[in-house]
Every structure is written in C-alpha cells, then in structure tokens.
Amino acid sequence: MKFFAVLALCIVGAIAHPLTSDEAALVKSSWAQVKHNEVDILYTVFKAYPDIQARFPQFAGKDLDTIKTSGQFATHATRIVSFLSELIALSGSESNLSAIYGLISKMGTDHKNRGITQTQFNKFRTALVSYISSNVAWGDNVAAAWTHALDNVYTAVFQIVTA
C-alpha cells in the first residue's frame, strides 16, 4: 500500500507544473484542428513505426493500407484520440490535476501490463507530434506548449511503466 501512495505522489509531482492557460489554449486550438482525423493519426503512427502496429493483436501482421479502412481500425483510433482529447480538455486548470492523474495512471498501468516500453511510447509521441505539426500552424510557441504538455504526461507514465 505504501508503494502506491509513493507512486501517486511521484506522479502528482510529475504533473505539478501544469500548462499555463496560454499553453493550454495553444494545445487545445491546435488539437481541435486535427482531433477529428482519428484514422489518419493512428495510420501515421503505424506507418512510421510498424513495431507499434505489431503490438496490437487485431492489427499485427496485416497490411496497413487495408486495415485503415476497417471499422475496427476506426474504432481503436477513436479510443486513442478520445483519450488524448480528454486529457487536453482538462489541461490548463490546476483544479483538474487529480482527474488528469487518474487518466494517466490508468493508461500507464494498462500499458505496463501489456509490456509497452518507454521506447514505444516515445515513438508514438514522435509520430503524433509529426502529424500535428504537419497539419496545423506550427510555430515555436505551439511546439513549446506541446512539448510541455507531453513532457508532463510522459514523465508520469514513465514512472508507472518503470515501477
């Protein structure tokens, strides 16, 4: 029990530097421009990193261009993007930190149980940022806001994945 209390404190500490309202606004406005492209986002991740696709039993070993048009692919892409949308919607308000922690904690635990590594999380991040930056107005301010947001999330997730 003590372990979980310490882990919770570490995770809360990792997100103790929440986004400013300006950073949150930049992340939210850029995300709003792409969040309805769920299939394209997941396709971009799988195309860039086939080893991530291989981690999904329902997609492993299948032709990406073929599965991209399937309902199963669209459903899973929507799950991933909806999770990100929920985190982003909560960002920018310190009063939402416990809700953000709860979401990150569950996602981290679920992915730890599936054997997902820090390397795979980082690959996902790279592909996600590549997709967003290629599809929205992307300046240094937007890049910095996304870096801050993802650093917060990934620091917390890595504390869970490596625990």
From Swiss-Prot:
**Other known facts:** There are at least 12 different components in Midge globin.
Which PROSITE patterns does the annotation name? GLOBIN (PS01033)
In its keyword annotation, does this UniProt entry include Heme?
yes
* Segment forming the signal sequence: 1-16
InterPro entries found in the cross-reference section: Erythrocruorin, Globin, Globin-like_sf, Globin/Proto, Mb-like_M
What this protein is called in its record is: Globin CTT-Z
This entry carries the following GO cellular component terms, namely: extracellular region; hemoglobin complex
| Keywords recorded for this protein, A-Z | Heme, Iron, Metal-binding, Oxygen transport, Signal, Transport
Family per similarity comment: Belongs to the globin family.
* Top-level lineage group: Eukaryota
Q: Domain Globin: where? A: 18-162
> One GO molecular function term?
oxygen carrier activity
Positions of heme b binding: 76, 111
* Xref: Pfam families: Globin (PF00042)
The yes or no answer to whether the keyword Cell division is present is: no
Q: Which PANTHER family match?
A: GLOBIN-LIKE PROTEIN
